[in-house]
């Protein structure tokens, strides 16, 4: 049988006449990671021909007719290419590229066209750092997933917010091919800290543990006292009393002498008041919010001797002087050689002071004072034996001179008591007592008043703790 020429587009399937199959395409080896190829495109798969019809010839051979693939496939591939280009163009806009970079990226995406192409704009990285993996699965993954794979393999990524290179702990031999700017290791943490400290000049703040702490200061009292009885009462110790206790407590009391006409030692009641105050303070040492009037009230409850007395109880808490007074005993606060503050005598009339008697409630009689003190202030607390014979400004002058002579509080108190007794012995001259007598009509009275004298001098000083 004569051989018929094969029509164009027909395949000869006779024995030994089959056309040899086309050679298989060469396998495309996957490019190693971090290999720099600006355009890495996988070979597109060739579409298989469609069987159009078959015809049996007279010699028994069969002729098959094949046709090109349908246009639907071409349209589908074009659509897939368009879908791949769209997110790439959007990525270019989001990454903030300028006009020239965007124009360069768009043709690159169009030229790729293949299903296996991955571009730099898809992952937000530079083109040289992107590796094409080939196949449709590579394009199916999003740009975020590709970036996550690169970071997990120990690559270097750039943080767009902080513009700082962050490097994962894993490293491969391929990292050696990276540019020198990415291969520089980060500086040690110590160098970074030192640089920050130098720029912000915070070395002094961070080295506070090396600085010697400054000791805090507080104000305290240094107190001393002196007592001089009336010469006629020296055998019994006089009728005045005082106490000095810890933590800035002190006080004076002056027993009323009229009790002596009934054979009662007025000084006993005054001393019991002072002893009771000191005892209560010592028993409650360190307790907070103890007020002078509470101390006085407690001492008055425990006094058993008959009699009456004027009394003053005071406390310095480191800032304020708190004082409770009944009668004509009192205090002066001397600052810079002048009388800064003073108590006011509580009297019914001339030489007739208020007084507390056994069974009385001192809280109904007491007058309270609160005065803020400073370093260098001097408190002179005394019975009327001082204030009846020495003027207030004279007391301030004596205290100022004593401080210049560096005398101690006890020595200052002794000088004041001696001065008061000296003036009390005088029958001439003006005194606070003679002025008060003349003011109420005792004409021709002059000189001082000899009496018991109790003086407590307290100096406010700084104490380093």
Curated annotation (Swiss-Prot):
Sequence positions that bind Mn(2+) 2: 254, 384, 451
Superkingdom of the organism of origin: Eukaryota
Binding residues for Mn(2+) 1: 254-255
Biased composition (Pro residues): 18-30
Biased composition range(s): Low complexity: 84-106, 133-143
Keyword set, alphabetical order: Hydrolase, Magnesium, Manganese, Metal-binding, Protein phosphatase
Cofactor (UniProt): Mg(2+); Mn(2+)
Enzyme category, top tier: hydrolase
Organism field: Oryza sativa subsp. japonica (Rice)
EC number of the protein: 3.1.3.16
The family this protein is said to belong to: Belongs to the PP2C family.
Name by which UniProt lists this protein: Probable protein phosphatase 2C 71
Keyword rRNA-binding among record annotations: no
Span of domain PPM-type phosphatase: 222-460
One GO MF term: protein serine/threonine phosphatase activity
Signal peptide location: none
